[in-house]
């Protein structure tokens, strides 16, 4: 079990995360966790009680990084704090390379220039990180027209009540899934799967002829 989790960490986690509000012991939470495993979410956050309906997860939670939070406000604060810490650490690496080059009285080497380019991309990604709420609300952006940032935290509500006002207050953007039939909504679990796959469709580079290998599809993130 630990080996499988480590392998997923090494080769197929993506930098987006998801959070689910657990106020109604909703069976869709397990479905969302299962989809997070399938679509390579780096972390799953459960907001509310630690006890949640695991039936739909089919034990995939054992291979995910699952964190628990007492409130959506605490989750948002800790996520933004972590992003700020990564920005500071990356900027420190950039500055250190420049200082080393100046101390040698020579320009950056080709390898250092490449590292600076990679750092610039990481910093740009971090500066554009967002918390995104998935809900059908006035002013929300249709998912089909929305460009997900590479680093993001996707917020999903419980079946029925949807996201709490506290969650919506923490969101940078609100996105909804366009629907065209007589039904006015889809399940929270289905919505989570659609949103995660939309992120993958925008950011993942699927290697090979388009078929999954025996151990799953091989993919990387656009750089």
Question: What is each of the regions a protein language model found here?
Answer:
Residues 1-223:
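Post-transcriptional modification and biogenesis factors for structured RNAs
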């Amino acid at each position: 079990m630990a080996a499988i989790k480590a392998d997923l960490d090494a080769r197929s986690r993506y930098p987006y995360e998801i959070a689910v509000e657990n106020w109604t012991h909703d069976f869709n939470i397990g479905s969302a966790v299962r989809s997070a495993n399938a679509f390579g979410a780096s972390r799953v956050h459960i907001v509310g009680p630690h006890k949640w309906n695991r039936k739909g997860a089919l034990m995939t939670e054992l291979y995910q990084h699952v964190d628990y939070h007492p409130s959506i406000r605490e989750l948002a604060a800790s996520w933004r704090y972590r992003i700020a810490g990564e920005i500071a650490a990356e900027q420190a690496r950039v500055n250190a390379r420049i200082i080393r080059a100046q101390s040698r009285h020579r320009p950056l080497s080709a390898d250092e220039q490449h590292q600076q380019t990679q750092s610039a991309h990481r910093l740009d990604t971090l500066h554009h990180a967002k918390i995104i709420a998935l809900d059908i609300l006035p002013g929300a952006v249709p998912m089909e027209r929305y460009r997900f940032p590479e680093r993001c935290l996707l917020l999903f509500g419980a079946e029925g009540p949807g996201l709490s006002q506290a969650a919506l207050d923490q969101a940078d953007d609100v996105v909804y899934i366009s629907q065209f039939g007589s039904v006015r909504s889809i399940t929270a679990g289905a919505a989570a799967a659609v949103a995660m796959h939309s992120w993958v469709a925008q950011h993942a580079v699927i290697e090979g002829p388009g078929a999954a290998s025996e151990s799953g599809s091989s993919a990387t993130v656009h750089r």
